[in-house]
Amino acid sequence: MNDAKYVVVRSVQFKKGYKLAKKQGKDLPLLAWGVNQLAQDVPLPSNWKDHQLKGNMKQYRECHIGGYSDWLLIYEKRDTDLILYLFGTGTHAELFGM
């Protein structure tokens, strides 16, 4: 039974970040758990620091996967068509060029 409210759509950038995270040995089941929570419209734990981005990325939200300080998920919930759009995953430097 699939009780997800949102259909998950992965961007090319997210897919590349996912492959890199796999190569780096990151905890991919933890990422999958977070995506599943978001798809079911369940709030993430507070240590994930889920927040709205600002500036030219203000339509997206960002969270720290598992509470790690430098492993991020950038996403957008599109309520009009019930899509959870996964924009990217990676470190601040990988995602924002810092």
Regions found by a protein language model. Name each.
Residues 30-37, 52:
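Residue-level detector of alpha-helical secondary structure
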Residues 7-8, 46:
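Residues that recognize and position ribonucleotide moieties
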Residues 39-65:
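A short, surface-exposed loop/turn module that caps and links secondary-structure elements
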Residues 11:
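Residue-level signal for threonine
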Residues 1-7, 16, 23-28, 33, ...:
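Enriched for short, Lys/Arg-rich terminal
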